[in-house]
Design a protein with these regions (language model features):
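General small-molecule cofactor/ligand-binding pocket signal
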Residues: 31, 111-113, 187-189
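Well-ordered beta-strand scaffold positions
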Residues: 26-28
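Conserved beta-strand signature within the Rossmann-like core of class I S-adenosyl-L-methionine
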Residues: 159-166
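A short glycine-rich, Lys/Arg-flanked "PGG" loop and its adjoining helix->strand segment in the class I
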Residues: 146-158
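Conserved SAM/SAH cofactor-binding pocket of Class I
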Residues: 44-125, 131-134, 145
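Class I S-adenosyl-L-methionine
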Residues: 3-15, 171-202
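N-terminal auxiliary segments of SAM/dcSAM-dependent transferases
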Residues: 1-24, 34-35, 39
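Short "lid" loop at the C-terminus of a central beta-strand within the Rossmann-like core
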Residues: 138-140, 167-172
Length: 202
């Protein structure tokens, strides 16, 4: 797999595509492109998270960490139209797609924000989140992934939780142990076809 999806400015030539997200309650057609995560299909881990995660809070601030072209963020926004949904990613091409897809879907409660580095220090973003969903960029390596999660999980509001989906053979069990050793409550919430959804809280 190309590492370009976690680059700020992907170097791959543009190859526009379309991915359909068809759930029992939400149908979306999302523009994709080369240089972003899973441009040719809805990633199976993302699909698992969409299928099994409990409903988002009806209001408040909700985060899609590593939003890509916006599949998680737009489903969150569709399911919680009164919530403010934030999609963040380091990849500028992905953020442009997320914005375009939110606009085409008429989801005015989505904000797609390009961030730098691993931390959430950005005055455009809220200080606390009532829910975090993420299919995190495992392939950036453990040190960078741990720094990324350590920075963003601390922004969970009291009693809020995060749902992270990780492929088992890419380290879901070791990530769960790291979270627990770092002082977080981390439990396997669901599993399917080699993917694990972890529920993480304080």
């Amino acid at each position: 797999m190309s590492s370009q999806y976690f680059a700020e400015e992907p170097g791959a030539a543009h190859r526009p595509g379309l991915v359909h997200v068809v759930l029992s309650d939400v149908h979306l057609a999302l523009d994709t492109d080369s240089g972003v995560f899973s441009p040719g299909r809805l990633d199976p881990g993302t699909r698992l998270l969409l299928d099994v995660a409990p409903p988002p809070p009806a209001s408040g601030d909700v985060l899609d960490l590593g939003c890509g072209y916006g599949a998680l963020a737009l489903v969150l926004a569709s399911r919680a139209p009164a919530a403010r949904v934030w999609g963040v990613d380091i990849n500028r091409r992905a953020i442009a797609l997320c914005e375009r897809n939110a606009g085409r879907a008429g989801l005015a409660n989505v904000r797609c924000v390009a961030v730098t580095g691993t931390g959430p220090a950005d005055d455009r973003l809220p200080g606390r989140y009532d829910l975090i969903w993420s299919n995190p960029p495992i392939r950036i390596g453990k040190p960078a992934l741990h720094a990324l999660l350590a920075g963003w999980l601390t922004r969970l509001a009291p009693a809020a939780v995060a749902y992270l989906v990780v492929q088992r053979n890419l380290g879901s069990d070791s990530l769960q142990r790291w979270l627990e050793n770092s002082g977080w409550s981390a439990a396997r919430y669901a599993a399917r076809a080699g993917y694990r959804v972890l529920e993480v809280g304080r």
